[in-house]
Amino acid sequence: MNFDVSIDYLLIFIRCLQVGNAWRRLTDDSNDISWIAAGYPEGNTSELVFKAEGSGGMPEFISNLPAADVVWGAFKVVGVDNRGNTISRRPKYIFVKYLPGEVPTMKRARAGGHKGAIKQIIDAHIDVEIESASELTEEVIIQKLRAAGGAHQPTGYEFSNYSS
């Protein structure tokens, strides 16, 4: 048995577990995590690693996007349906593939091939692919959520500072 290969696969598995655990924290309503980010470790495009998480919603997620590196992440948006005496709150999860124009061609190609595997870990309501943080706006997300939703649409959305 080649232990080097086994250890490499084990490390990749553990790192994917870290991303999966971050996803579970994001979707667990008992904590205040509202976004997660994953990417490649420095100088390696064959592994996915957990990078960061936070509680500041979409604005904080955007502020943590690097200028020139690949990020896969997700954040929570709360759909609020206020119909008089009944208020319903439902979390929606947004998957983001961030691939800035400054990323080298080979790294871009590798990132494109990894999206399917990452989507196996991060299973969100909608997907957004962006090259610039300025492309990620509340209006874009609301439009995609409304297009993906059924007949019963929320009356509004919260992107941070989720009220109870």
List the model feature ranges, each with a label.
Residues M1-S164:
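Long, low-complexity regulatory segments enriched in Ser/Thr/Pro/Gly and acidic residues
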